[in-house]
């Protein structure tokens, strides 16, 4: 079949490079690097490797702000996943990844392959994946298309995760109109590793073979990385060919085979990397560049599942379930035999060279020959113009929103029926969260907890981000996202260790959007420094706009913490009647960006809630100490819907009630002030708990009751609600909306 690719002249004169994602200045830079005009394959290589998705060319200046080091960090940013030390020679590898654009176009496969990709990132480090989490954003559930997106995305996550046998143990979902045509699907994978097994994605050692393992290469996902680096349009729905198709059963075999190699053949394994965004070109050029080496690849040897594939297609394909290995000379047959045992193909497709060039050969001809660092390291970096949006100052000066609270119980019920607050049981029951039998705290509490086999330890994990706060004030909102994630870990009995961040923003070419990115990074960095949770991995997803309409700034924070002793595991639900209820933290009239403001005004505006990081850290440390000393029966972070929602949620599981007198007016029941915790304590531990908290803003509110009634009093005012009625509304909202 004749190759009808455009000539170098046509690429230049017809500006075909623009269609591939390169700007005029970038194309000129490529010509300057090569000392000639690139051919079609070379133009394709640069277009994907210099896309935002692969090069972070627009976000690098911002990413440099993040603190990435700490005594607990075994592997920081730059590899497949970050790793933290949990003692006993063990580490936890974790990372979050987005699959936003593909999930709008083809929600089932988009979500499924997002799960598959992040799992490969984690096991490529040498870690066994032990848990999945997700962070999802959708528009309001008031159209058939919105309901379809939710159902298909959840089915895709469940279909892949359940089939591969990794429990999906936690996550979060927010519903807002800005996500109607820009849904966000962020998947996080957590793995366990022996520190001695940590791998690098590198190809070094002159003459060492590079091996392709896993599924054959097809034409799916070509230019997927570029697709993820441009603004969306309605026509974008036609870009289904840029969405990959996943096979979880193939991935399960690949996972076991790769861990087998890492565990038992580490002496002959030089490096290993997932073929993710930008496929073979990305993994191979990055592995060579990191090692300061070159690479020669023979395209004829790449396993192909379609006829007449060109080098361009093979290099850029994002077919799933593929890995690239660099092994020591003389051990190819050993590796092939191992993969054969799993029914997988392992093929030599090239070798490491010493010239730092990336040479591609097809049918005996050199079809691409470019400096490897130019592809993998030297993409141009842009510091985009930044401008404060006019809305920001207007929000700062706006008169504070005062909610209508004539019918407190009526508002309470309405809030519990909002899908962002309502029970997500209908969603998470589609996930297998008990497979592997190590899940100690299942979805529905503040953080998920997975036991570490052979120890008394457990790993706490969560994903968090309230993007409404970031829309009001990205710096404060970014800090709150980290603080809330840490609160959830602490409430569960864990010490926060580190974060992975999924930075989802609109079009960075717009100065107002780049300002949001910069400010959010400032807030995240400040919180990470104060709470000692360095950023050890992450992902950037920009251009989340459709037809000019963008999302709220949504930097998803995935956090992992260590529960030192299984006895410290704590959940949000009240345990026994008679237990004493405490509130840690101060409640103010803060409704801007709240679920209540959205409910009553149909929009959000005003000043974001205040956050004092020093106070936040102090309260977290005190609460964790109380939990570790065995003084706490239950613990719950106050988030969306404030005290009223947290109190109701704490009663639901055991069908208990509560009788409390609060130190704030009842119209502040649903304020979303930060740095607050709802805690219950056994009567015999009350004195010790109160003594520990002695000098702080900690309030004894009342007791857990046997009946299913919640009574809340402030001075002369009192409201009463039935737990069973509130729970019925809370549990029924999402199934009803999805009908």
UniProtKB/Swiss-Prot annotation:
It comes from Listeria monocytogenes serovar 1/2a (strain ATCC BAA-679 / EGD-e). Monomer. Part of the FGAM synthase complex composed of 1 PurL, 1 PurQ and 2 PurS subunits. Mg(2+) 2 binds at residues 121, 274. This is Phosphoribosylformylglycinamidine synthase subunit PurL. NCBIfam families: FGAM_synth_II, PRK01213.1. Keywords: ATP-binding, Cytoplasm, Ligase, Magnesium, Metal-binding, Nucleotide-binding, Purine biosynthesis. Gene3D superfamilies: PurM-like C-terminal domain, PurM-like, N-terminal domain. GO terms for cellular component: cytoplasm. The lineage of its organism: Bacteria, Bacillati, Bacillota, Bacilli, Bacillales.
């Amino acid at each position: 079949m004749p190759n009808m690719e455009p000539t170098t002249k046509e690429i230049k004169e017809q500006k075909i490079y623009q269609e591939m994602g390169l700007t005029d200045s970038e194309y000129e830079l490529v010509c300057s690097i090569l000392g000639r005009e690139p051919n079609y394959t070379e133009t394709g290589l640069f277009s994907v490797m210099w896309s935002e998705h692969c090069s972070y060319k627009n976000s690098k200046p911002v990413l440099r702000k993040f603190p990435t080091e700490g005594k607990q960090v075994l592997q920081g940013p730059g590899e497949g996943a970050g790793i933290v030390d949990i003692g006993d020679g063990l580490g936890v590898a974790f990372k979050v990844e987005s699959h936003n654009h593909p999930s709008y176009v083809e929600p089932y496969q988009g979500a499924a392959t997002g799960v598959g990709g992040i799992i490969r990132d984690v096991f490529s480090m040498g870690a066994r994946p032990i848990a999945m989490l997700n962070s999802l954003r959708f528009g309001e559930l008031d159209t058939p298309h919105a309901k379809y997106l939710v159902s298909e995305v959840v089915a895709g996550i469940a279909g892949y995760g359940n089939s591969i046998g990794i429990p999906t143990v936690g996550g979060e979902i927010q519903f807002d109109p800005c996500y109607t045509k820009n849904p966000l699907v962020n998947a996080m994978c957590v793995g366990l590793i022996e520190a001695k097994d940590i791998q690098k994605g590198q190809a070094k050692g002159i003459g060492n073979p590079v091996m392709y393992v896993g599924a054959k290469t097809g034409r799916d996902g070509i230019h997927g990385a570029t697709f993820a680096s441009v603004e969306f349009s309605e026509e974008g729905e036609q870009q289904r060919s840029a969405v990959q198709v996943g096979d979880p059963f193939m991935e399960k075999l690949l996972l076991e085979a790769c861990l087998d190699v890492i565990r038992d053949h580490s002496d002959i394994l030089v490096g290993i990397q997932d073929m993710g965004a930008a496929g073979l070109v990305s993994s191979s050029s990055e592995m060579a560049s990191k090692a300061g080496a070159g690479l020669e690849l023979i395209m004829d040897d790449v396993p192909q599942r379609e006829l007449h594939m060109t080098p361009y297609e093979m290099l850029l394909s994002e077919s799933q379930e593929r890995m690239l290995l660099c092994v020591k000379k003389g051990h190819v047959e050993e590796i092939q035999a191992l993969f054969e045992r799993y029914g997988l193909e392992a093929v030599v497709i090239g070798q490491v060279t010493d010239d730092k060039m990336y040479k591609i050969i097809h049918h005996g001809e050199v079809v691409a020959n470019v400096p490897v660092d130019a592809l993998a390291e030297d993409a141009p970096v842009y510091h985009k113009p930044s401008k404060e949006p006019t809305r920001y100052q207007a929000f700062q000066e706006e008169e504070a929103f005062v909610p209508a609270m004539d019918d407190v119980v009526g508002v309470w019920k309405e809030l519990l029926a909002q899908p962002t607050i309502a029970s997500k049981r209908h969603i998470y029951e589609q996930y297998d969260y008990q497979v592997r039998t190590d899940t100690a705290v299942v979805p529905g509490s503040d953080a998920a907890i997975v036991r570490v086999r052979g120890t008394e330890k457990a790993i706490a994990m969560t994903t968090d981000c309230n993007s409404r706060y970031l829309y009001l004030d990205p710096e404060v909102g970014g800090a709150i996202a980290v603080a809330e994630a840490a609160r959830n870990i602490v409430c569960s009995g864990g010490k926060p260790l580190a974060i992975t961040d999924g930075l989802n923003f609109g079009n960075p070419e717009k100065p107002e959007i780049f300002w949001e990115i910069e400010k959010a990074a400032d807030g995240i960095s400040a919180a990470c420094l104060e709470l000692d949770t360095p950023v050890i991995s992450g992902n950037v997803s920009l251009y989340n706009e459709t037809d000019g309409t963008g999302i709220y700034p949504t930097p998803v924070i995935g956090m992992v913490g260590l529960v030192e002793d299984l006895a410290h595991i704590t959940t949000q639900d009240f345990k026994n009647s008679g237990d004493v209820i405490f509130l840690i933290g101060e409640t103010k009239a803060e409704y801007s960006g709240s679920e209540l403001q959205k409910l009553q005004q149909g929009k959000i505006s005003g000043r974001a809630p205040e956050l004092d990081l020093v106070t936040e850290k102090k309260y977290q440390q005190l609460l964790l100490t109380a939990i570790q000393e065995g003084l706490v029966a239950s613990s719950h972070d106050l988030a969306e819907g404030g005290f009223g929602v947290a109190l109701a949620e704490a009663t639901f599981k055991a069908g208990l009630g509560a009788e409390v007198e609060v130190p704030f007016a009842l119209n502040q029941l649903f304020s979303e002030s930060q740095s607050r915790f709802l805690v219950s304590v056994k009567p015999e531990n009350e004195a010790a708990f109160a003594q520990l908290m002695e000098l702080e803003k900690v309030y004894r509110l009342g007791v857990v009751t046997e009946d299913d009634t919640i009574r809340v009093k402030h001075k002369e005012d009192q409201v009463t609600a039935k737990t069973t009625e509130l729970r019925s509304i809370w549990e029924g909202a999402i199934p009803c909306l999805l009908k």
